[in-house]
Regions:
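DPxDG-like acidic metal-binding loop motif
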Residues: 65-101
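Phosphate/pyrophosphate-binding loops at sites that engage ATP/ADP/AMP, CoA/4′-phosphopantetheine
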Residues: 49-65, 153-158
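Generic recognition of short, well-ordered alpha-helical segments
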Residues: 44, 79-80, 111
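Short amphipathic alpha-helical face segments that pack within enzyme cores
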Residues: 44-47, 83, 87, 104, ...
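Short glycine-aspartate micro-motif
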Residues: 8-10, 63-69, 77, 116-119
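Oxyanion-binding and handling regions
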Residues: 1-27, 38, 97-226
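N-terminal phosphate-binding loop and adjacent alpha-helix
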Residues: 36-54
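Short amphipathic
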Residues: 30-33
Length: 226
């Protein structure tokens, strides 16, 4: 029996779809992924997480930490994942781990002696960008950039990206909770946690809600009546 063997539960809703994964200190034990867009993350991630928790209970594992994606990514997706992960961490009095989405793009790639620039397609010719050293440690903060003819990567650097970007580099699949769990495992073993009470996802670019034209006209109408 694995009666009290500790495991890490990873939850990812940062990009398209959602997923969960369970890992011990050495290997992935459980994973479930949904990568379509027809169903909202909010609808599925709760049930996926319950299934993962039930699986742990049935197999005698104890969830010792929660990991989630720190961002950047989908504003709504990040908020959903953060709320769920923080709720579980608070409710179970266990630590929380947050890993950069851009750092996950490097997982599984061969070693590289120079810098790696990770890019995440943000739509409309824009991207989230972050630079990492040969060991995978961030050299700067994630930024929001426009990929135009004037954009270029420093010489001798490697580019890895997700999405449809006009750059020369290595295209990788969007990361899932399996990737998150694999990377977060080292955080867990080093006890590298975030403050659950104060941590918020790194959106990089401030969220701007789009208000429909009818709502704008209604507000103008009400203001004139006041």
């Amino acid at each position: 029996m694995n009666a009290t063997k500790p495991v890490l539960l990873a939850i990812d809703t940062a990009l398209q779809g959602c997923s969960v994964a369970v890992t011990d200190s050495e290997q992935i034990l459980y994973t479930k992924v949904y990568q379509e867009t027809e169903i909202s993350n909010a609808v599925l991630i709760g049930s996926y997480t319950k299934e993962a928790i039930s699986w742990c209970q049935e197999h005698g594992y104890q969830i010792a930490a929660i990991a989630t994606t720190d961002g950047p990514g989908s504003y709504t997706g990040l908020r959903i994942g953060a709320a769920l992960a923080k709720g579980l961490a608070f409710g179970r009095s266990i630590p929380l781990i947050a890993v950069s989405t851009l750092q996950l793009l490097l997982a599984g790639l061969p070693s590289f002696a120079g810098e790696t620039i990770a890019l995440l397609d943000a739509g409309h010719g824009n991207a989230y960008q972050q630079t990492f050293d040969a060991g995978g440690t961030p050299r700067d903060k994630a930024t929001f950039v426009t990929i135009s003819s004037e954009w270029h990567a420093p010489a001798e650097s490697r580019i890895v990206y997700v999405g449809s970007l006009p750059v020369e580099g290595t295209a990788v699949a969007p990361p899932t909770a399996k990737t998150l769990a694999t990377v977060a495992r080292s955080y867990w073993l080093r006890e590298q946690y975030v403050d659950t009470a104060y941590w918020e996802p790194n959106y990089v670019k401030p969220y701007k809600a789009v208000v429909g034209q009818n709502k704008v006209l209604e507000r103008l109408k009400l203001s004139k009546q006041a």
